[in-house]
């Protein structure tokens, strides 16, 4: 048995995200272009509970705007600040992630989880096409 306090002081919401096999969230659009989530009123604190998950992050305000972050159970929480494009990928065995989010005034779940395609966002597409991602593996 292993009991650890995994609290996030800032958290006021929690989501359990289960991929039972290989999965991409959000999935590519109908023409095969990558899609991302972008929360305007939520910071994510994603922690892998089981398996492994890789996150792709793009933030126009960062010095290095494109990151790929590989997480496992030992990684700790990946903080994804609001206004960061993000998507996640699980391998064949799937993964379970708990997101201990911080939601801000104005949060509306019907607007915060709409996939955004790089096919119709030229700025996002340009970053994915031209910038080399910074690759991180946390928890090794």
Describe the function of each predicted region.
Residues 4-73, 92-140:
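Active-site region of the double-stranded beta-helix
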